[in-house]
């Protein structure tokens, strides 16, 4: 039980750390916009984004929380595959969002929200008109690399068999129950 709780908290705080690190990466990528900013301003950006990071980490930790609960009844290979599949999905999702956000900010001048998605789905030709082929290829490569890095982090800290195997399933055998029953009858 303790290992599951530690794993759940580790998953949550890992998501929070990833989101917190994305802000300075974005600022570093657009360092010309932030060249006059002091270190305290960089930390203020992280601080002001923390409530959103905490809530999004909570949303993304809901499925692992259910998987941790399910692991109390058994650690099957199916559960492990679901676990790995979820983190592959999250790695790809986070890499697509972060990479598209980096790429579109240069052209549109604001961070990714529902507006670019609406614009893309209403007129896809106009949405990608200012983007070169090399930018698309580079973006896809960056997404792949970032997704692989994220999954590597998730695998190293959460998904390896050594880490996954620490969640012991409580086993209750028939002989253990009989011995406990006998002790209770003697008292």
Where do the language-model regions lie?
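Alpha-helical transmembrane segments and their helix-start/interface "positive-inside/aromatic belt" motifs
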Residues: 2-13, 80-89
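N-terminal signal-anchor transmembrane alpha helix
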Residues: 14-21
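Hydrophobic cores of alpha-helical transmembrane segments in multi-pass inner/ER membrane proteins
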Residues: 56-67, 140-154
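Membrane-interface helix-boundary motifs at transmembrane edges
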Residues: 73-82, 160-168
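Cytosolic-side transmembrane helix boundary signature
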Residues: 145-173
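Conserved small/polar residues in nucleotide/adenosyl-binding loops
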Residues: 175-184
């Amino acid at each position: 039980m303790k290992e599951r709780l530690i794993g759940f908290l580790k998953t949550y705080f890992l998501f929070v750390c990833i989101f917190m690190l994305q802000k300075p990466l974005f600022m570093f990528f657009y360092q010309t916009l932030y060249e006059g900013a002091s270190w305290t301003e960089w930390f203020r950006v992280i601080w002001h984004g923390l409530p959103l990071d905490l809530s999004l980490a909570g949303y993304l930790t809901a499925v692992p929380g259910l998987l941790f609960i399910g692991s109390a009844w058994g650690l099957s290979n199916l559960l492990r595959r679901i676990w790995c599949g979820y983190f592959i999905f999250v790695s790809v999702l986070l890499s697509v969002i972060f990479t598209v956000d980096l790429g579109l900010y240069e052209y549109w001048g604001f961070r990714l929200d529902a507006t670019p998605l609406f614009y893309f789905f209403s007129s896809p030709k106009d949405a990608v008109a200012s983007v070169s082929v090399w930018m698309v290829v580079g973006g896809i490569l960056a997404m792949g690399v970032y997704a692989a890095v994220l999954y590597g982090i998730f695998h190293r800290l959460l998904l390896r068999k050594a880490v996954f195997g620490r969640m012991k399933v409580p086993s209750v055998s028939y002989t253990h129950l009989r011995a406990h029953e006998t002790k209770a009858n003697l008292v």
